[in-house]
Amino acid sequence: MLLDTQLELAGGINNVTRILAPQGQVVLALKHPPHAPHLPDDVSLQSVLGEWQLSVQRTAEVSDQQLATIGKAISERQKLETLPYQTALDCPYRPLWHISPPQGLLNDPNGFIYHQGEYHLFYQWHPFVCEHKDKYWVHLKSLDLVHWQWQSVALTPSDWFDSHGVFSGHAVSHQQDLWLFYTGNTRLGVDRQRQTMQCAARMNANGEFEKLGPVIRCLPEGVTEHIRDPKVIYTQGKWHMLLGAQTLAHQGRLAVYHSDDLLHWHFDKLYGDELGNYGYMWECPDWFELQGEAFFVFGPQGIASANPHHTIEHQNRIFRATQNAQGEIALLQGWPLDEGFDFYAPQTAQTTDGRRVLCGWMGLPDETQHPSCDQGWIHQLTALRELEWREGKIYQHPLRELDTLRSEPHTLLLSDTVTELKAKSFDVQVTLPWGCQLRLMQNAQYCVTLTLDAENRLLRLDRSATQIRQGDTIRELKLDSPTVELRILADQSSLEIFINQGEHVMTSRIFTPLDATGISLHGASVDAKLYYMAPASAPFNLEVNV
């Protein structure tokens, strides 16, 4: 059957919500059942999980280009449907200088890169509700890594290869072109069978992204449909694509492909056997060099923590790695990148002066119940961080350009007397002795505490006395330093705590009422340096709707 005939039976393109192409079929998902009184014998109409689907056998006359034409029409409609959700809703928890979504759910940062004089950053977005479904990509640009401007909804889940979500990936700046690589996610049938393909898109002269379709259609041997989040790098004279993967034995591994032209890819092998049973899935890989060392960043899922307070299976890790002359990868020692409550899926980019800068998702895959959901949005990205490799350790520092948002410094005496900062966006720097407790974002009922447990040499972050609705409430970090040096970045409903000059970081969402702006120190009296943080440019298409 011709595609035009199927569209006519479906009630026209405006009645089509998705297009699927499973196993020699063309399936059109519909808003409403078709009005045709009788369908031809070779046409199937069924309700799949509440969605009407019109299916026919795909004939030789139906090309990928014809399917792409339908995908473009769906994409244009999807972009129009997001317009009411591009107006940022006012909310006391909304950050002043972090990136947050105007409405809906934000998750992984994607495509973080410098290209032709500008920094580009994308993020995963479901615009309509605070749920993980049918992901879009939002495109932001910046000249200074501080002030980000909304560009567009770059990619939508409109095509047969990404109908249920434009999943995470990275960007490549090659010659004059900006390429995006991502995982296309589709779900088929009543059992929602997952189908995964690695896809590409390229920016045109108008700044719009044109999908090139799947560049890897089939799974490598020994891997489930859980293979995603392409990172593309150029080493040893060829392109390499790194993918987080799950083996048939349900072990996380790194899958690597190579290519000469970014379009035709060949599978190399799976890496990571030296780590043994290190989680049931790896996702969101990144790879970079720092001070002459190679590093692999990923999100292992299913690693149990020895600490009873840590119950979340979604972890973050960075491993020192090597790649030999044959391109084979070995993973050496590894560490957590962040030891707070809310940090996942980081990506890095290199600045024009050679710094390696990281941005992560300040959230976790299973968290969808934050207080900001009452105002129609959830999650934000982390502050950008500079990475340093020094004396066998990774150090993280707040991006130096963020200092342009700081006020003049104020000296603050921290004691058991509560000082009202009258603001929740600030930068506090202090060195504390063991045996004291710092309270932040405090009023008579709520606060978050940092306890320096002298007996056990533990730094304990406790958010149980906040408005948090979901997730762990205690994190503990073992330290051996004689004192604890802290730099704390706060932004309305988040804390990023840089410990001992960035040797450790704890990133967390902290929800307390708008009037909870007190700070106090119990068990010691110490001078601190305080800076108030000014707002950055709002990263939204439309002004905040109060």
Curated annotation (Swiss-Prot):
Stored Pfam families: Glyco_hydro_32C (PF08244), Glyco_hydro_32N (PF00251)
GO cellular component: cytoplasm
Keyword Ribosomal protein (UniProt): no
GO BP of this protein: sucrose metabolic process
Keywords, sorted A to Z: Cytoplasm, Glycosidase, Hydrolase
Catalytic residues, chain numbering: 108
Enzymatic reactions: Hydrolysis of terminal non-reducing beta-D-fructofuranoside residues in beta-D-fructofuranosides
Top EC class of this enzyme: hydrolase
Main location: cytoplasm
Pathway: Glycan biosynthesis; sucrose metabolism
InterPro entries recorded: ConA-like_dom_sf (IPR013320), GH32_Enzymes (IPR051214), Glyco_hydro_32 (IPR001362), Glyco_hydro_32_AS (IPR018053), Glyco_hydro_32_C (IPR013189), Glyco_hydro_32_N (IPR013148), Glyco_hydro_beta-prop_sf (IPR023296), Suc6P_hydrolase (IPR006232)
CDD domains: GH32_ScrB-like
Domain of life according to the entry: Bacteria
GO MF annotations, alphabetized: beta-fructofuranosidase activity
Intracellular or extracellular location(s): Cytoplasm
Residue sites binding substrate per the record: 105-108, 124, 167-168, 228-229, 283
Keyword Transmembrane in record: no
EC number, UniProt record: 3.2.1.26
Function: Enables the bacterium to metabolize sucrose as a sole carbon source.
Family classification: Belongs to the glycosyl hydrolase 32 family.
Protein name, UniProt field: Probable sucrose-6-phosphate hydrolase
